[in-house]
Amino acid sequence: MIRIAIDCMGGDFGLPVTIPAAIEFARQFPDTRLLLVGLPDAIEAALAERRDAPRDRLDIVPATEVVSMDDPVEVALRRKKDSSMRLAAQAVKDGRADACISAGNTGAWMAISRYVLKTLDGIDRPAIATSIPNQTGRATTVLDLGANVDCSAEHLLQFAIMGAALSQAVDHRDRPTVGLLNIGEEIIKGNEVVKEAAELLRASPLNFYGNVEGNDIFKGTVDVVVCDGFVGNVVLKSVEGLAKMLSSVIREEFKRNFITLLAGAFAKPVLNRLRNRVDNRRYNGAALLGLRGVVIKSHGSADAYAFGFALQRAREAVASKLLERTAQTVAQITKRVQSGEAVAPGAAGDTA
């Protein structure tokens, strides 16, 4: 039985999203038990509205406080010690849950998770990773997405190790290729941190492809793309904005006149398939890698459909033993790097 603790109060919408998503998820996956963490009376009232809720696998964990989306990290971490967010992470720490998930304040969730669970040996900073759909029909894992604005070359190497472990565990890639996001493929491109990180990656046992550019994320050139949190967050928000704009433009164009409406009717099956491939809700659920527990961050504005996919990400991470694989991969590669062992980098993106 896979146990997932949910911060039911987090996000822009809270219970109207988390409870319906939890119920549908529990019905879809009978091998899961959900810990619903939050204000008990409010959760009980929300569950009472759904007669189809599998109550035998939905456990309410009472909390007396809620971390709001605009709470400073210090307030969430030091003052709200009985918050639904804090208790969800604590459930993993205590062994009562295998994973935890929140749609709440990203900075607070990262700080609380790191404080409660601590980082893995060999990891200085956790990183946020998610999947972005590409033209191959699969997805590219990208990290960091905002947890670490300023990074050293060593941090980028650690992100690459964790990203490769995530790709192996969840996406079932035997030896995932890793690319370093840069302004060009040439080894002379980039700032000093990126250049130094590239040298560390070339000397590591990872399957390092070389430098990649932003368009390579969507081409599926590599399995994992590594960058600092500042760049990664800009990439993520740009992708989300572009997807919404394209969807809006396509809708407007097909509604322009009778002919375009007719064309839209014929094109509807194709458009539906396209929508499913690029719908960012289907890729909701970023993993906070490098912690001693499986921690998932849902988008704050997620609806119940999107939050359900974040729950699926948590379930997949536990089922694929992501935590154990990440710890093992970090230990193995750290040992090999310290011993001076290296492999030849992939030359495709490693041009002069």
From Swiss-Prot:
Ranges annotated as spanning the membrane: none
Catalysed reactions, semicolon-separated: a fatty acyl-[ACP] + phosphate = an acyl phosphate + holo-[ACP]
A GO molecular function held by the record: phosphate:acyl-[acyl carrier protein] acyltransferase activity
Keyword Lipid metabolism belongs to the record: yes
Subcellular location: Cytoplasm
Gene Ontology CC terms: cytoplasm
Pathway assigned in UniProt: Lipid metabolism; phospholipid metabolism
Any one Pfam family match given in the protein's UniProt record, by short name: FA_synthesis
E.C. code: 2.3.1.274
GO BP of this protein: fatty acid biosynthetic process; phospholipid biosynthetic process
Keywords carried by this UniProt record: Cytoplasm, Lipid biosynthesis, Lipid metabolism, Phospholipid biosynthesis, Phospholipid metabolism, Transferase
InterPro entries: FA_synthesis (IPR003664), Phospholipid_synth_PlsX-like (IPR012281)
Enzyme class, broadest EC rank: transferase
Subunit annotation: Homodimer. Probably interacts with PlsY.
PANTHER family, alphabetized: FATTY ACID/PHOSPHOLIPID SYNTHESIS PROTEIN PLSX, PHOSPHATE ACYLTRANSFERASE
The family this protein is said to belong to: Belongs to the PlsX family.
NCBIfam families linked: plsX (TIGR00182)
Function: Catalyzes the reversible formation of acyl-phosphate (acyl-PO(4)) from acyl-[acyl-carrier-protein] (acyl-ACP). This enzyme utilizes acyl-ACP as fatty acyl donor, but not acyl-CoA.
Annotated protein name in UniProt: Phosphate acyltransferase
